Regions:
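Aromatic-lined carbohydrate-binding surfaces of glycoside hydrolases
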Residues: 4-215
Length: 215
């Protein structure tokens, strides 16, 4: 047998993009093999973002959106990683309800396996990415439209709710509570506020306020 000791206690693995290549089409057989491979290679903190659309469905419903509006806000499965990174909305959608439901059951299996191997899954949290209807429902909220990404048309651009706004904290709490109800938690979360997109402002003070609000 070969034994290698890591220099650090925790080893984080994966990023949002890796969930957008072949992973959208993985079933449990692929995931089980991959999780076992991660365990053999000393991964302790795998990113685990599968199934979050069901959580968002419940959150956005509570704010008055219809199921049709919510599923049309999501992209299709092949582009969902970039929707989760706040790059694009709606492209190749709406997201099928059957796919959303199946991903919940898959995520439960993923998390059970990872935790059984002493891993601490890193779950998603709210980055400020909201459907366009939220700006109509809450006209006074600090919501801005994200500038273009990768040449996608204006209809696919995202909206960003500033973490300094009280609505951000309300949505964050609602999301984490529902996610914990569905999937449990290891109290470790990953949030990428501006992935390949422009921040509303590059003023250092504003960026500091955004970071504090998200944290």
């Amino acid at each position: 047998p070969v034994r290698v000791e890591a220099r650090v206690k925790e080893r984080f693995f994966l990023n949002y993009c890796t969930f957008g290549y072949t992973m959208p089409w993985w079933g449990w057989n692929e995931w089980e093999r991959f999780i076992d491979w991660m365990a053999l290679n000393g991964v302790t903190m795998p990113l685990a973002i599968t199934g979050q659309e069901a959580v968002w469905q419940k959150v956005w419903r509570s704010h008055g959106l219809t199921d049709e509006e919510i599923r049309s806000y999501f992209t299709g499965p092949a582009h969902l990683a970039w929707h989760r990174m706040s790059n694009i909305d709606g492209f190749d959608g709406p997201l099928p309800q059957g796919w959303i439901d199946a991903q919940v059951e898959l995520q439960k299996k993923i998390l059970e396996r990872e935790r059984s191997l002493n891993m601490k899954p890193v779950l998603p949290a709210f980055s400020g990415h909201v459907p366009s209807q939220i700006k109509e429902i809450y006209p006074s909220a600090q919501i801005t439209r994200v500038k273009g990404w990768a040449g996608f048309p204006e209809e696919n651009l995202c909206h960003f709710l500033a973490p300094m706004d009280s609505l951000y904290h309300r949505i964050q709490r609602e999301f984490l509570e529902e996610q914990t109800r569905l999937f449990g938690t290891d109290h470790i979360y990953g949030v990428d506020l501006f992935n390949e997109v422009e921040a509303p402002s590059w003023d250092p003070q504003t960026l500091a306020e955004i970071s504090r609000g998200a944290y």
